[in-house]
Every structure is written in structure tokens, then in C-alpha cells.
From Swiss-Prot:
Catalytic activity: S-adenosyl 3-(methylsulfanyl)propylamine + putrescine = S-methyl-5'-thioadenosine + spermidine + H(+)
Lineage of producing organism: Bacteria, Bacillati, Bacillota, Clostridia, Eubacteriales
The protein's enzyme class: transferase
Segments forming domain PABS: 2-236
UniProt binding sites for S-methyl-5'-thioadenosine: 31, 106, 138-139
UniProt name for this protein: Polyamine aminopropyltransferase
UniProt organism field: Clostridium tetani (strain Massachusetts / E88)
The keyword Cytoplasm appears for this protein: yes
């Protein structure tokens, strides 16, 4: 008998994956956690029934959420990641030679532990790097307790439900601004404009109310609903579209390129209409 994973993040649409093997499934203090091996996309991290990442395409998300803000900032030395227990974002951050310290703040220790065990190629030992500090705890509380400390804050969260819901609130972005240095930058994954336009619009508006420079950029991520995903970047000073990205990167990537950095900010008309005007049916 075939076993299928059915993901129902969108109420009127589902995605299904044929499972080869269930590697772990448990109830943690915060969520249901599973790691499954699928035929189509390899091993996947699944939280509360929603796919978070897969071995086959994880690099798209992790490269885009990292290199866009880190190349926008002229000298990022200290970076905070809220969420991101799989370690992929830390892996990409530590490719930048200017980075002296990267803090991973993950609320669920089981995510870190099980990803190290079953998805080791995602972190690629980055969490053991001397520049990385892993803090198990509430990201909102951590941000509130640190002022004028980080050059870049990356919200590498699950979807805006359950434990991650507070990470999408407008008041939280004000706290992030206080956590950042005077020319700091923040970025967050902000869902798909196809199925969740109201979230994309709300986060964009909330960021714009706090950060003078707020932009939306896009990436093609097959694992996620619609395959077309948005990220919102907020900056106190620096424009990500004018970032001085080197013509040749000093490290290897699979998705991000200097030309793609600029191109990712070119939005289709329906997304422009969404963020620059009222949502229409």
C-alpha cells in the first residue's frame, strides 16, 4: 500500500507527496514534528502537517533569505536568525567573510536535534562553527531583550500560525528595528501572493510603517504552495536594489546570483497591484 503525505496549508488546495519512509514523527512541546523521505523531493521537514523544507530545493529559500540582506548591508558583522532550526540559513550566513557572529534563536530544540540527525546536509555542520551561537528560546523575547546589537535580523519562521504567529505582527517589527544597529536590515519569508495575498500585503504594510526602505522580492520554490514565494526586506538606510553585489561571488551557490539579486525585485503586475494598492477580489 502506498503512503502519501497530504499537506493542506491552503484550505481549498492540497499538495501530496509519496512517502518512501518516515524517519521520525513526534509531538514536541510546541508542534507536531515529522521528517519523511519522499520519492519526489527527498527528505522533508514537516511541522504541524506543513512542509518546511526539502533536500531537493532547500537551497533556494536559504540562499535568497540570506544573501539578499547580507549583500545589501555594507559590512554585516552580527546576524540574528529567528527560527531556522534546520540550520540552512546559518550555513549561508557563514559564507560571508565579514560575519563575526551568527545567533540562531529557535524555540523548539527538537527541530535542531532531529534536523542534525536526519537532514545533516542542510546545516552542513554550520551550527558547530565557532562563529555560531545556538540559543533555544522564544524569538520575540530574545529580540525584546537585545537593543542596537545586530546588523541583520532574519525571520526564518514557519507559517503565521501557532508558535510563529507573533513573528508576523506589526508591533514585532518595531522591536526588530530597536534590535538592529543604526543601518540595520531585516528580512522575513512572507508567504505566496497567489493563495495568501492578505498576509503578503499586511506584512509589507507593517514593515513599511517601521522601515524607510521596504521592498518585496520573489523566488521560485517548488516545495511551497504555488511554487512562487515572497520575502519582505526592511532597511533603515540601504536600498537592496542598489546593493553592491560583486560580479563574481566568493562562494558557491545553486540559485542566487548577482543578476538574480536585482531581478528578484521585479514584480509581476498582480503583485505590484497587491502591495501598492488595496487587495481586489
Amino acid at each position: 500500500m502506498d503512503l502519501w503525505l497530504k499537506e493542506g496549508q491552503i484550505s481549498d488546495a492540497v499538495m501530496t507527496y509519496k512517502i518512501k519512509e518516515t524517519l521520525v514523527r513526534k509531538k514536541t512541546e510546541y508542534q507536531d514534528l515529522a521528517i519523511v523521505d519522499t520519492y519526489a523531493l527527498g527528505r522533508m521537514l514537516v511541522l504541524d502537517g506543513i512542509v518546511q523544507t526539502s533536500i531537493k530545493d532547500e537551497y533556494v529559500y536559504h540562499e535568497m533569505i540570506t544573501h539578499i540582506p547580507l549583500y545589501t548591508h555594507p559590512n554585516p558583522k552580527k546576524v540574528l536568525v529567528v527560527g531556522g532550526g534546520d540550520g540552512g540559513t546559518i550555513r549561508e550566513i557563514l559564507k560571508h567573510p565579514s560575519v563575526e557572529k551568527a545567533v540562531l534563536c529557535e524555540i523548539d530544540e527538537e527541530v535542531v536535534k532531529e534536523c542534525k540527525k536526519h537532514l545533516p546536509e542542510i546545516s552542513n555542520n554550520a551550527l558547530e562553527d565557532s562563529r555560531c551561537e545556538v540559543f533555544i528560546g522564544d524569538g520575540i523575547k530574545y529580540v525584546n531583550e537585545h537593543k542596537n546589537e545586530f546588523d541583520v535580523v532574519i525571520i526564518d519562521s514557519t507559517d503565521p500560525f501557532g508558535a510563529a504567529e507573533g513573528l508576523f505582527g506589526g508591533s514585532f517589527y518595531g522591536k526588530i528595528s530597536e534590535c538592529l544597529t543604526e543601518d540595520g536590515i531585516f528580512v522575513a519569508q512572507t508567504e505566496t501572493p497567489f493563495y495568501l495575498p492578505e498576509i503578503v500585503k499586511r506584512v509589507y504594510d507593517d514593515s513599511k510603517a517601521v522601515f524607510p526602505v521596504t521592498k518585496l522580492f520573489m523566488a521560485a520554490i517548488p516545495t511551497y504552495p504555488s511554487g512562487y514565494w515572497s520575502f519582505t526586506i526592511g532597511s533603515k538606510k540601504h536600498d537592496p536594489e542598489k546593493a553592491p553585489v560583486p560580479e563574481v561571488l566568493p562562494f558557491e551557490t545553486k540559485y542566487y546570483t548577482p543578476r538574480l539579486h536585482s531581478a528578484s525585485f521585479v514584480l509581476p503586475k498582480f503583485v505590484e497591484n497587491l502591495i501598492f494598492a488595496n487587495i481586489s477580489e
